[in-house]
């Protein structure tokens, strides 16, 4: 049964990384509901992407491992539900404002 998952990805901050992440999700037919991407406040060369996804737990585990194989990705973590997504998006909005 499909559920909502929050996926947080820490990676290099360059142009092709976000495209590669989206390609991995599209190949697996994972639905992206929301996406936030921003650079790390301490190091502009590092970036963070937070995605709200709609998929199965088994497929989410496979996507996580596939994303961690990308050279630019440092780590990928996910949790069930959308609470973490909204918490991280509020934190990001406060930093921007």
Q: Where are the model-predicted features located?
A:
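A conserved regulatory-domain signal marking ACT and ACT-like small-molecule sensing domains
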Residues: 1-97
């Amino acid at each position: 049964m499909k559920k909502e998952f929050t996926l947080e990805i820490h990676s290099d901050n360059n142009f092709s990384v976000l495209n590669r992440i989206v390609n991995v999700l599209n190949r697996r037919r994972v639905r992206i509901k929301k996406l936030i991407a921003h650079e790390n406040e301490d190091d502009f060369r590092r970036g963070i992407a937070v995605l709200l996804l709609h998929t199965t737990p088994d497929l989410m585990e496979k996507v996580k491992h596939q994303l961690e194989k990308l050279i630019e990705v440092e780590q990928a973590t996910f949790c069930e539900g959308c609470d973490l997504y909204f918490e991280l998006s509020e934190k990001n909005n406060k930093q921007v404002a």
